């Protein structure tokens, strides 16, 4: 009887020791995952700051684009402004919305840094980022088509290129379109990071 009791005591002790080892091993495995998620969240925050700069640059550059030629006739004054074209007006509105959204998304990005396993904030960001990348690309593509016509014209439609006369105007709108496409690419990278972070959840 005594030997049986001793064997039982030894088995119980070994079981507790194995359980403690399993818990310690599990914590050691989970810690690198938390560190990876936090690193992804920090990179996401940096991308959002960069996207804010790109979207704001696109908005302000396009929104302040205006050029008046130094010569005019008795009845005409040659002027080019962004609000003369609906595509450019849509471009300014879309990038302004994207800029505002990026500012509002910063607190949620910080939450993902502080709490790497918070799935709700990350899921909200990936949904809104997807909407914003669609809006930004649509605006940039529409404006890019107008910029192409301004540079090259269209002989079939008898549309002449205007960039030889309005060179400052064309340079400004071209730069704004490039900045908007950069913002769209940054949005795509943020979506990839969010999807990867959710996959590792």
From Swiss-Prot:
Annotated membrane topology: Multi-pass membrane protein
Transmembrane segments: 39-59, 90-110, 130-150, 176-196
UniProt xrefs under InterPro entries: CASP/CASPL (IPR006459), CASP_dom (IPR006702), CASPL (IPR044173)
Keyword presence, Transmembrane helix: yes
Domain of life: Eukaryota
Database matches in Pfam families: CASP_dom
Subcellular location: Cell membrane
GO CC annotation terms, alphabetical: Casparian strip; plasma membrane
Entry keywords, A to Z: Cell membrane, Cell wall biogenesis/degradation, Membrane, Transmembrane, Transmembrane helix
UniProt record, GO biological process: cell wall modification; cell-cell junction assembly
Extracellular topological domain residue ranges: 60-89, 151-175
Sequence ranges on the Cytoplasmic membrane side: 1-38, 111-129, 197-201
Role: Regulates membrane-cell wall junctions and localized cell wall deposition. Required for establishment of the Casparian strip membrane domain (CSD) and the subsequent formation of Casparian strips, a cell wall modification of the root endodermis that determines an apoplastic barrier between the intraorganismal apoplasm and the extraorganismal apoplasm and prevents lateral diffusion.
Family: Belongs to the Casparian strip membrane proteins (CASP) family.
Subunit and partners: Homodimer and heterodimers.
Protein name, as recorded: Casparian strip membrane protein 2
């Amino acid at each position: 009887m005594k030997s049986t009791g001793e064997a039982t005591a030894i088995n119980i002790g070994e079981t507790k020791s194995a359980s403690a080892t399993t818990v310690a091993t599990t914590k050691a495995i989970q810690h690198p995952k938390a560190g990876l998620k936090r690193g992804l969240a920090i990179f996401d925050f940096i991308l959002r700051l960069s996207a804010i700069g790109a979207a704001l640059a696109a908005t302000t550059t396009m929104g302040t684009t205006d050029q008046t030629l130094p010569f005019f006739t008795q009845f005409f004054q040659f002027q080019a402004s962004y609000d003369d074209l609906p595509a450019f007006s849509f471009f300014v509105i879309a990038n302004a919305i994207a800029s505002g959204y990026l500012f509002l998304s910063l607190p949620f990005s910080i939450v993902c840094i502080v709490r790497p396993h918070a799935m709700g904030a990350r899921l909200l960001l990936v949904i809104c980022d997807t909407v914003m990348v669609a809006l930004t690309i649509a605006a940039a593509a529409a404006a890019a088509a107008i910029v192409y016509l301004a540079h090259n014209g269209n002989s079939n439609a008898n549309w002449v290129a205007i960039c030889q006369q309005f060179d400052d105007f064309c340079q400004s709108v071209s730069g704004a379109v490039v900045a908007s496409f950069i913002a769209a690419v940054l949005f795509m990278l943020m979506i990839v990071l969010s999807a990867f972070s959710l996959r590792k959840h």
